[in-house]
Amino acid sequence: MEKEATPQQQPPVVDPARLKQLNLAIETLEKQFGKGAIMRLGDDSAVMHVQVISTGSMALDYALGVGGLPRGRVTEIYGPESSGKTTLALHAIAEAQKNGGIAALVDAEHAFDPTYARKLGVDINALLVSQPESGEQALSIVETLVRSGAVDIIVIDSVAALVPQAELEGEMGDSVVGLQARLMSQALRKLTGAISKSSSVCLFINQLRDKIGVMYGSPETTTGGKALKFYSSVRLDIRKIAQIKDGEELVGNRTKVKVVKNKVAPPFKTAEFDILYGEGISVLGELIDLAVEFGIIKKSGAWFSYGTEKLGQGRENVKKLLKEDETLRNTIRQQVRDMLTGAPTA
């Protein structure tokens, strides 16, 4: 016997009197706290799509699942010294500026190098830079910039350098246990709400420390307490995995980034790319790696080929060819992007 088709369930009818009371309550809340203080998730005004700023690395944008660093969220980049944390942040600043965005750098370490930033594509003349004297001043500047709603990306370099005022005013050797953690916890409680209402990317750079007496598990931890781990929507762990040499000369590092936390897409994905000294992320090197991975460029031994055309022997020679041949470079880049986004290739 054929089963009878069950009639499609209609949504329950809400009592008009209750609906009227609800609408009055929503109007009152919007008058008191502004439009968007409360909304139905199905309304057009409720933003469902995550807006992003590119990291400057196609592989990392893909690993993040949404195409870049999410706007209106807190992101943390951490790793050992000289692993590429600031380089990655400067690339994100450059990408924001390329699209007409405003970028700010809160340089708590007082170590910003404008010459290097310019080489990575950062517009130094348009970049807002602050070198605060204390952690409270730095986080107050961040809050003001976020609440302005005019800044696209704010980078704080770094959490470890956000020294509380009480520590600065004290003597060397004074006990300051938990001061920075309390400062970060208080600041992030205030900041996250403001950031979510803005379209800013708030990017904290953090350092690693070793926990004493850890026998099992990783002894590594980040500075500034647990608040940043909790409030971050995205956490990126960046590490050097190999050195890049040109003959005997050291020219860069092979870098691996792991997405250890992601609230906007599935986490635990990884991306690998080259960071070259004085140049930053090697866009051509990454393009070749992704093209080989997706089978767009074929690799046989040391030889690389595209279709029936031999590109050259060795990765460095292929990079030189792609640098000179703009048409071929753009064709391969578009095919790689299509593979990353799932679009059909031509």
Curated annotation (Swiss-Prot):
UniProt protein name: Protein RecA
Recorded GO CC terms: cytosol
PROSITE patterns: RECA_1, RECA_2, RECA_3
Cross-referenced NCBIfam families: tigrfam_recA
Family: Belongs to the RecA family.
Domain of life of the organism encoding this protein: Bacteria
Organism (species): Chlorobaculum tepidum (strain ATCC 49652 / DSM 12025 / NBRC 103806 / TLS)
SUPFAM superfamilies assigned: P-loop containing nucleoside triphosphate hydrolases, RecA protein, C-terminal domain
Its biological purpose: Can catalyze the hydrolysis of ATP in the presence of single-stranded DNA, the ATP-dependent uptake of single-stranded DNA by duplex DNA, and the ATP-dependent hybridization of homologous single-stranded DNAs. It interacts with LexA causing its activation and leading to its autocatalytic cleavage.
Compartment annotation: Cytoplasm
InterPro entries for this protein: AAA+_ATPase, DNA_recomb/repair_RecA, DNA_recomb/repair_RecA_CS, P-loop_NTPase, RecA-like_C, RecA-like_N, RecA_ATP-bd, RecA_C_sf
BP GO terms, sorted: DNA recombination; DNA repair; SOS response
Pfam families: RecA (PF00154), RecA_C (PF21096)
Record keywords, A-Z: ATP-binding, Cytoplasm, DNA damage, DNA recombination, DNA repair, DNA-binding, Nucleotide-binding, SOS response
A GO molecular-function annotation: ATP binding
Gene name, Swiss-Prot/TrEMBL: recA
Binding site for ATP: 79-86
UniProt signal peptide: none
